[in-house]
């Protein structure tokens, strides 16, 4: 297989396979979660669980109180850099937007590539810091499973290969681009079945906890 | 009589796993922030006390029983089953080092209600026979005697007599049609009878009708702490029956955290029906009286004081502003503790920890968090609204040789009650 | 022209002076990206080089490659180099026809066995040998037979190098490239549809100078010409960096000469010398004319999902696939939901109420303590 065949495969068959598993997995996981049901709360509620659930979806992304911020500073800061960085890199790079345009039929404006590049670097630094933290912090070292390191790699490889292919470093661009796309496909394949599923289940989790707390009148 | 078994425990966990739990487990990224929020971790530095790790067996069960991949792995013999040894090992994580305080649920960035899951985990632990002896004993006493501390009606009656003598007011018992049914915690009966005095006087001033019930005076619920909905339902059922029999409008949960959770929030779900009466914490009632102008105080508390928010009231109960409104009336020198309100640190003894001797050592260690909070304030008095917090605060301060008195908010208010006759006394 | 004549003799015969010859050597060096210090060595090599015999076979092709080469205007280095070889068989160009033509090939092969250069344009059909024959001989047979005595093979054009358009999906003739068939000879792939003329002659100049084939990339192409990416050498690259893209061929962006990425330019994955060597006597290359690169020097360029589809867009229809996967996920989800609900209903039905008498397991030591 030469680089052109490889590139064609990852843009074609590989993408098909990844999409099938990704979509299948996400839908399956949503069914697995939602059909387990949740008993109706019979206690007289103080607030609208529905409203508070949605509020929690948004507000959980904001920093908590300043002491929590101080105590979990490393996790919170690297977490923000990672997630904002991923957002910029995935959704604001012109070639990525044109990919979404190709799939969904609509696009949005891109930002200039060197800025995306900067975010990619920041995101990778954040991920390296997160890995270091995971390897050295007693709690994280204790909690971490093989899957935690595996999904770290699943997230890091698309970034580094994207960076290397953009800068035409290390390997021939076609190979690098192919590996980049393949690494994203691997990410898609494993996302619904690993803790990376938080990318979409977090909305459900936040909604449930927000509404349960909201019904008690607690701002979650 | 049947007995607990691993199978019953697992079946109970299977019953507990629902959509929120599945969403929570799907969303945890092992970020470790819950550990930073848990006083059992912050004060011991022990990573095994990380809140999400306390429900790890339940996570595996969820995966094995309720996901397609997990089911396949289980069918192929690739998954690790839950064993007796494992759950025995988990007892200290689930019971000794968790007060169900809910701080972890507040900080979790993906919004997992970890505390709620530990509560569910306890269902499996108790049904499986993995609950600590201390909580089993408390549950037995609660069901058989009517109080986890073994307080019987005669003891209450003796306290009523004292209170009637001290206040010069009659304490109503089993009065049908009263507005409020007042519940007490055993600790209030045995250690803090001032509470009974206080509400007697406050209701008298407010001109409200109220009653105690000889068949259901105990508000605490060991079933909630041990994590058995069946036992909790039996205990709540007594209160519900009493409230219905006496046709009261409102049942008042006393100065106790988990009792409020048990009756106010879990109660209707435990007995599977909506209540025909209201449930309020005493602070909610007092704040309502204040707003209606029925709670009149005079004088002020000179001491510099702070308020310790009981977890079950603030984070798990939504009673945050009421104590502050009430303190506003009498305490100009009130200062907030760091992290006060919904983010307040637990005293370290809630959720059954105080009833569990195995947890004594770690409970005292966890108290260091509260000690640091109080030390930084330089205050004369700590006010709270939970008898269990109060005992732990007293114990902890004594061990740490800190001489700060602890007061219940209700009783402090009563001390400043304006001595005038209620306008509607005759008509009430 | 005899095969024994050296290049120098040939050039002299054509009235090229010593000075002109050295100038030619310098140009050849620059084509091959060699330093000027190499010029004397090149001159020495070329002076004594014998004009090699070249046999040019054309299979499934459009003659565009030969056109590209022969349309280059003289006097050019390309032309000079073609004077320096003995093109013994090229059925488009040669005067002979029929049996005579084939005899010329056979004779050239016999005379120069082991020394001649075989140039091939066009792909070879494997589906049915009858799809393409010359004088009754299938392309496959002719290639195999002619390749046997070749010193080296130069595959010219994307059809000969990678199968090209004949191989495009669904590849009705079963077309393959030269390197798919010949495994035991050095092959230089000069891809492009067509290749840049100077690239073809550059390879021949290299062979004449050094008697070897140039250094090749992983696709068998001379690195000298295929080492650079069109995108990297593109004068519109700054617009790509700034995120300024033409969205249609007649919008403002197109008029301002913005990047053509979104209009399907394959520059980022195309390796060729177009952006530097340019076409039509160095006039321009396609992007300068306002059209994206088609990636014609790359394998499968016809099947990369569409010339006007951005490179980052899927080469296939993903939406349809996703819709099926959604359905399958829902079916599997409903299945697992039914199983889960049954499991939950079962444990609820079998639920034995936990009383205070059920809080201990059957642990003899504990039971005794309890009883006492």
Map each language-model feature to its residues.
Chain B
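Short cysteine clusters
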Residues: 28-34, 38, 98-104, 108, ...
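Cofactor-cradling patches in redox/metallo enzymes
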Residues: 187-275, 312-329, 335-428
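Long, charged N-terminal interaction/targeting segments
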Residues: 8-51
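Conserved beta-strand elements of the Class I
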Residues: 181-182, 306, 380-383
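Iron-sulfur-cluster electron-transfer modules
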Residues: 8, 15-25, 55, 59-269
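A short, charged/proline- and glycine-enriched loop
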Residues: 175-180, 299-305
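Active-site glycine-rich loop that binds ribose-phosphate moieties when present
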Residues: 233-239, 285-293
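Iron-sulfur (Fe-S) cluster-binding segments and ferredoxin-like electron-carrier domains
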Residues: 36-65, 106-125, 318, 352-366, ...
């Amino acid at each position: 297989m030469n680089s052109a065949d490889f590139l064609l495969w990852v843009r074609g068959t590989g993408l098909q396979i990844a999409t099938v598993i990704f979509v299948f997995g996400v839908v399956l996981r949503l069914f697995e979660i939602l059909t387990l049901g949740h008993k109706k709360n019979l206690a007289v509620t103080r607030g609208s669980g529905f409203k508070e659930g949605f509020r929690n979806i948004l507000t959980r992304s904001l920093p908590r109180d300043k002491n929590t911020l101080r105590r979990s500073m490393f996790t919170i800061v690297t977490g923000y850099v990672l997630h904002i960085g991923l957002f910029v890199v995935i959704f604001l790079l012109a070639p990525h937007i044109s990919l979404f345009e190709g799939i969904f039929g609509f696009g949005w404006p891109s930002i200039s590539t060197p800025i995306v590049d900067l975010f990619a670097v920041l995101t990778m630094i954040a991920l390296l810091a997160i890995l270091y933290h995971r390897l050295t912090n007693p709690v994280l070292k204790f909690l971490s499973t093989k899957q935690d390191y595996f999904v770290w790699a699943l997230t890091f490889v698309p970034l580094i290969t994207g960076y290397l292919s953009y800068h035409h470093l290390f390997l021939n661009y076609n190979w690098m681009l192919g590996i980049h796309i393949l690494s994203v496909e691997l990410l898609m394949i494993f996302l619904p079945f690993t803790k990376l599923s938080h990318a979409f289940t977090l909305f459900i989790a936040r909604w449930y906890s927000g509404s349960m707390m909201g019904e008690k009148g607690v701002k979650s | 009589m049947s007995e607990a078994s691993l199978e019953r425990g697992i079946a109970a966990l299977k019953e507990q796993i629902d959509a929120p739990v599945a969403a929570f487990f799907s969303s945890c990224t092992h970020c470790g922030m819950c550990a930073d929020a848990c006083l059992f971790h912050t004060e011991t530095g022990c990573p095994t006390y990380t809140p999400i790790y306390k429900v790890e067996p339940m996570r595996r069960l969820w995966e094995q029983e309720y996901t397609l991949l997990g089911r396949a792995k289980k069918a192929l013999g690739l998954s690790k089953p839950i064993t007796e040894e494992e759950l025995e090992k988990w007892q200290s994580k689930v019971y000794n080092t968790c007060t169900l305080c809910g701080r972890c649920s507040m900080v979790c960035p993906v919004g997992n209600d970890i505390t709620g899951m530990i509560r569910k985990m306890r269902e499996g632990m108790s049904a499986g026979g993995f609950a600590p002896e201390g909580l089993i004993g408390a549950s037995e006493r609660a069901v058989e005697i009517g109080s986890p501390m073994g307080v019987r009606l005669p003891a209450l009656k003796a306290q009523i007599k004292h209170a009637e003598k001290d206040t010069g007011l009659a304490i109503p018992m089993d009065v049908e049609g009263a507005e409020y049914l007042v519940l007490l915690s055993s600790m209030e009966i045995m250690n803090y009878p001032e509470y009974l005095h206080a509400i007697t006087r406050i209701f008298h001033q407010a001109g409200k009708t109220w009653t105690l019930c000889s068949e259901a005076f105990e508000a605490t619920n060991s079933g909630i702490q041990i994590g058995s909905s069946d036992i909790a339902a039996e205990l709540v059922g007594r209160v519900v029956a009493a409230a219905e029999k006496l046709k009261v409008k409102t049942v008042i949960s006393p100065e106790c955290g988990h009792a409020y959770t048990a009756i106010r929030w879990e109660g209707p779900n435990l007995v599977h029906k909506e209540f025909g009466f209201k449930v309020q914490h005493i602070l909610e009632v007092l704040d309502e009286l204040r707003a209606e102008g029925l709670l009149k105080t005079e004088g002020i508390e000179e001491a510099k004081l702070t308020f310790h928010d009981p977890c079950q009231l603030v984070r798990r109960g939504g009673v945050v502003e009421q104590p502050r409104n009430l303190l506003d009336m009498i305490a100009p020198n009130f200062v907030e503790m760091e992290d006060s309100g919904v983010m307040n640190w637990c005293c370290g003894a809630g959720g059954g920890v105080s009833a569990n001797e195995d947890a004594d050592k770690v409970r005292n260690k966890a108290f260091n968090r509260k000690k640091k909070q109080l030390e930084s304030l330089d205050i004369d008095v700590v006010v709270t609204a939970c008898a269990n917090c109060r005992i732990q605060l007293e114990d902890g301060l004594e061990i740490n040789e800190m001489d700060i008195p602890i007061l219940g908010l209700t009783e402090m208010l009563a001390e400043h009650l304006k001595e005038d006759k209620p306008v509607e006394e005759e008509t009430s | 022209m005899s095969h024994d004549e050296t290049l120098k003799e040939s050039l002299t015969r054509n009235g090229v002076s010593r000075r002109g010859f050295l100038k030619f050597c310098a140009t050849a060096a620059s084509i091959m990206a060699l330093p000027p210090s190499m010029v004397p060595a090149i001159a020495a090599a070329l002076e004594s080089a014998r004009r090699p015999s070249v046999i040019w076979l054309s299979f499934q092709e459009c003659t565009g490659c030969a056109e590209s080469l022969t349309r280059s205007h003289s006097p050019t280095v390309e032309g000079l180099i073609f004077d320096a070889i003995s093109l013994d068989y090229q059925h488009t160009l040669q005067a002979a026809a029929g049996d005579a033509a084939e005899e010329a090939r056979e004779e050239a092969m016999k005379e120069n066995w082991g020394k001649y250069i075989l140039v091939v344009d066009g792909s070879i059909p494997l589906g049915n040998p009858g799809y393409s024959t010359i004088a009754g001989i299938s392309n496959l047979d002719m290639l195999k037979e002619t390749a046997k005595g070749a010193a080296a093979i130069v595959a010219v054009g994307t059809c000969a190098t990678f199968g090209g358009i004949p191989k495009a999906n669904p590849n009705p003739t079963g077309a393959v490239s030269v390197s798919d068939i010949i495994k035991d000879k050095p092959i230089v792939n000069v891809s492009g549809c067509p290749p840049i003329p100077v690239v073809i002659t550059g390879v021949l100049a290299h062979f004449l100078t050094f008697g070897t084939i140039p250094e090749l990339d992983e696709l068998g192409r001379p690195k000298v010409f295929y080492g650079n990416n069109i995108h990297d050498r593109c004068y519109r690259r700054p617009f790509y960096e700034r995120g300024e893209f033409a969205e249609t061929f007649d919008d403002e962006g197109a008029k301002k000469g913005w990047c053509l990425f979104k209009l399907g330019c394959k520059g980022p994955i195309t390796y060729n010398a177009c952006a530097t060597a340019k076409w039509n006597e160095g006039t321009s290359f396609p992007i300068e004319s306002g059209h994206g690169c088609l990636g014609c020097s790359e394998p499968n360029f016809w099947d990369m999902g569409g010339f006007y589809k951005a490179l980052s867009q899927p080469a296939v229809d993903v939406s349809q696939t996703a819709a099926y996967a959604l359905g399958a996920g829902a079916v599997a989800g409903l299945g697992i939901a039914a199983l889960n609900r049954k499991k939950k209903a079962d444990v609820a039905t079998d639920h034995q109420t936990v009383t205070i008498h059920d809080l201990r397991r059957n642990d003899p030591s504990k039971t005794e303590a309890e009883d006492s």
